[in-house]
Amino acid sequence: MTRTAVLLLTLLFLVAMAASDKIKTREVCWTEEECENWE
């Protein structure tokens, strides 16, 4: 594997983690105010 491929995979992984994090918070709270309280 080249260094570029590893870098791209890492970025993809981080983006996926961030996205799943957002989805989890969305399930817990319905308004922005509630979301801020959860952080």
From Swiss-Prot:
S-S bonds: 29-35
The keyword Cell cycle belongs to this UniProt entry's keyword annotation: no
GO MF annotation terms: toxin activity
Keyword Signal annotated: yes
UniProt keyword list: Disulfide bond, Neurotoxin, Secreted, Signal, Toxin
Annotated signal peptide: 1-20
Free-text comment on this protein's domains from its UniProt entry: The cysteine framework is C-C.
Function: Probable neurotoxin.
Protein's UniProt name: Contryphan-Cal1
Organism: Californiconus californicus (California cone)
